[in-house]
Amino acid sequence: MKKKVLVGMSGGVDSSVAAYLLKEQGYEVIGVTMQIWQDDEEFIEKEGGCCSLSAVADARRVANKIGIPFYVMNFKDAFKRNVIDYFVDEYMEGRTPNPCIACNKFIKFSSFLDKAMAMGIDYVATGHYAIIEKHNDRYIIKKSEDDRKDQTYALYNLTQFQLERTLMPCGQYKKSKIREIAKEIGLRVHNKKDSEEICFIPDNDHGRYIKNRFPNKVREGNFVDKQGNILGTHKGIVYYTIGQRKGLGIAFGKPMYVVDINPFRNEVVLGDLEDLLNTELIAKDINYIPFDTLKDPMEVEAKIRYSQTPSKAIITPIEDGRVRVNFHEKQRAITKGQSVVFYKDDLLIGGGIIEK
């Protein structure tokens, strides 16, 4: 009897080819687009986002082409609660969230997987560029064949339960090959542009998005230097993130960067590039993939943002399940709320949220 797999289809080329590859491998494939858009004109009408209405049409067209059933499933409430509300709250607290990591943790590999299990379906699948393997009774995640498209940074939260029930067929290929396969089988999405923006913010202007929804919470405040001297007026702390130089709306005669955000005083602290450089951070909410807990310091390569090349570091377990990360070289703009992710060569060790 064929194993069943529920494929999350965003209307893009990766998830479309993932569905095709799994069908070719002999699975009984069911395509699903997760309805996460809110009752919001700009979100609904937005073209090209990973879960917009136009994406549903693309996904349905692909499903028809490759001959699999297709459904739209409603995850609006879970998405609002776990992704949008978290996103807004983090910015209001002066931190910089990563909504894609939250979506993977709470929606794609939790709510979506729960739905599949309830339907008696064996697996869920996505178009992520990562490789899941089983080694000595434990599931691991390795970097994909395509270094440039590798998405393991956003997958460090996956549990053994989730990995056992997840398929990622695109991880074995380079993006160029995925597009080639899509073209060969006649999928119109073969040359569809990759989605790079936050799916629920059409223009990627998170400050404007939050201000529109909570106009009373976003207040002007002071730009200050490290000594607390007032340098000017900012639009609201939600508009800024650590390391930001452009868009400050004020000229200083030299480059100035956001080096800290104080939500309690509603202040944005500005400083020099040197103020952004650091070798140490503390991370919380740690999840490990190849093992359950870390008892001793470990040499790893770590990165503090998605597009960064990993840097050598030592991770040391400390109290409350947190870790101290000491980099061999200074890192620029270590940002509270973002994730730090650990590797050993191409093996994903785990990661957590940067606390300080």
From Swiss-Prot:
State the Gene Ontology BP annotations. tRNA wobble position uridine thiolation
Ordered alphabetically, the record's keywords are: ATP-binding, Cytoplasm, Disulfide bond, Nucleotide-binding, RNA-binding, Transferase, tRNA processing, tRNA-binding
Chain spans, region Interaction with tRNA: 149-151, 305-306
User: Which E.C. number(s) belong to this protein?
Assistant: 2.8.1.13
Protein's UniProt keywords contain Zinc-finger: no
The record places the active site at C103 (nucleophile), C199 (cysteine persulfide intermediate)
Subcellular compartments:
Cytoplasm
GO MF terms held by the record: ATP binding; tRNA binding; tRNA-uridine 2-sulfurtransferase activity
Q: Spell out the disulfide connections.
A: C103-C199
Q: Which reaction does it catalyse?
A: S-sulfanyl-L-cysteinyl-[protein] + uridine(34) in tRNA + AH2 + ATP = 2-thiouridine(34) in tRNA + L-cysteinyl-[protein] + A + AMP + diphosphate + H(+)
Instruction: From the UniProt record, list the coiled-coil ranges.
Output: none
Site-annotated residues for Interaction with tRNA: H128, Q338
* One annotated Gene Ontology cellular component of this protein: cytoplasm
**Residues at which ATP binds:** G8, M9, S10, G11, G12, V13, D14, S15, M34, G127
Q: What does this protein do?
A: Catalyzes the 2-thiolation of uridine at the wobble position (U34) of tRNA, leading to the formation of s(2)U34.
Instruction: Give the family, as the similarity comment puts it.
Output: Belongs to the MnmA/TRMU family.
Q: What is this protein called?
A: tRNA-specific 2-thiouridylase MnmA 2
Give the organism the record lists: Clostridium botulinum (strain Okra / Type B1)
